[in-house]
Amino acid sequence: MVWSTNIKHEGLKSWIDEVAKLTTPKDIRLCDGSDTEYDELCTLMESTGTMIRLNPEFHPNCFLVRSSADDVARVEQFTFICTSTEAEAGPTNNWRDPQEMRRELHQLFRGCMQGRTLYIVPFCMGPLDSPFSIVGVELTDSPYVVCSMKIMTRMGDDVLRSLGTSGKFLKCLHSVGKPLSPGEADVSWPCNPKSMRIVHFQDDSSVMSFGSGYGGNALLGKKCVALRLASYMAKSQGWLAEHMLIIGITNPEGKKKYFSASFPSACGKTNLAMLMPKLPGWKIECIGDDIAWIRPGRDGRLYAVNPEYGFFGVAPGTSERTNPNALATCRSNSIFTNVALTADGDVWWEGLTEQPPEPLTDWLGKPWKPGGSPAAHPNSRFTAPLRQCPSLDPEWNSPQGVPLDAIIFGGRRSETIPLVYEALSWEHGVTIGAGMSSTTTAAIVGQLGKLRHDPFAMLPFCGYNMAYYFQHWLSFAENRSLKLPKIFGVNWFRKNNQGEFLWPGFSENLRVLEWIFQRTDGLEDIAERTPIGYLPNIQKFNLNGLNLDLQTVQELFSVDAEGWLAEVENIGEYLKIFGSDCPQQITDELLRIKSELKEK
């Protein structure tokens, strides 16, 4: 076979042979990552009805893809962590015995690529020449995955060359799980919802994914490698793999700092990563909007890289008002999945414009009528190259990463949590991360206003016992040679009694970043100590031009003692799921906050 002559790595070659014997594809193709290959595969998908080319006047070299209605999101119930013991996976993960799961998957994968091409996709998470980076090889029968991996990762010949004859790589096997009999016509989005499995084996750092063609389940470099496998590796190797954005922020005097920030989904991570400042002289630049790998540098500071090469952004709600940089980023060379299509070949989703254009074809390919179900799926996406972001930071591809001055944790909370507060210590900061939660919306979970705990925004992505993960974070404070960043909590989503947001949000969030910037510079008089952390001194916080009334300001920046006592109680109750594995330092911090609040 031609593919094998181009692979010098015997271990890789024998694995591909083994997979081919199991899955029985009709062809095998080694992907080189070239633009020519990308164009060829897009043309192939146009011919099968998988892709629709958009009007090049609006979106040059862009495509719309419609998935099956039952393959539209990550599937937590079919996502498994396989470790030698169940305790190692912890109470927040679905655990399966590795040997049992391998036998089960072996049966599922047997003959699953019949009638399809097996694509060999060498990819690198992180800059190729970086000590941070991890190389993987994904074997997949989905051309959609190949094209998406070209956008989302460094992929192709350069990665294969870097492996040489014996370099380490992670084995990532994926199939849509729909073999084709001779003469059987394919469907535009093959998948196998009844047999979906997204499985992570921590004993050999491998992933096997079956039955889904959707993003996080099928682009195995993203959540599977960059978070679930990487977080497990990071624990033993002394670093962190986090669900975080990374931004550079420059003040009017030209001083620059880097922040990372962790938010659960639907809390504005991409909007903050691409924020366009309204305050004169300030600049925000984006390194990444979703994943950060963080390692101690030689100088003792923590350095972060974005292991990804593209954005996989949620489309609904993205507009010229909320995120003009995101719209500019996905204007060309992008793939849109499950958005609506206009009559003149453009894309549309809820929130893009105030009024929907008519006529519209919805994400299922049917004529759309106003007042019915959404035209674009709520989890519809754009996949766009990182380098197209207008506010891309010059250090976006730095092999060493960028030094962090602040780590920010946030959630969607309508009450109690102030606009911004600073942890009193690293241990307190870890407690803020462990206690993160968001108020769900009816669209997400049926019950409006229910609190959903999501520690460090890593609940779906931590590849091992979360209590051990908390302990790993705490261990950084034990290393006296480290110069750790300050930790902050933020909440853009406080509401008044009428249910209206107290804070304007979006570009005005720069005012919060300005205060954080000043605190990392050591300005003491702009903050006041409280039981829950350092809160802004209202007189020293930049509210100029916002026209907020005094009551609103007080609600945004005050400590609601009663609310916080309930909050501490709620966090403590949640952490009971970890039993005696929950670190004592976190319990001690919660007790400290409780006793100080009662003394007030």
Curated annotation (Swiss-Prot):
Major localisation:
cytoplasm
Name under which the protein is recorded: Phosphoenolpyruvate carboxykinase [GTP]
Organism from which the protein derives = Chlamydia pneumoniae
Lineage of the species this protein comes from: Bacteria, Pseudomonadati, Chlamydiota, Chlamydiia, Chlamydiales
Q: Which reaction does it catalyse?
A: oxaloacetate + GTP = phosphoenolpyruvate + GDP + CO2
Binding annotation for GTP:
266-271, 381, 412, 506-509
Q: Is Transmembrane found in the keyword set?
A: no
Q: Which InterPro entries match?
A: PEP_carboxykin_GTP_CS, PEP_carboxykinase_C, PEP_carboxykinase_GTP, PEP_carboxykinase_GTP_C, PEP_carboxykinase_GTP_N, PEP_carboxykinase_N
Active site positions: 267
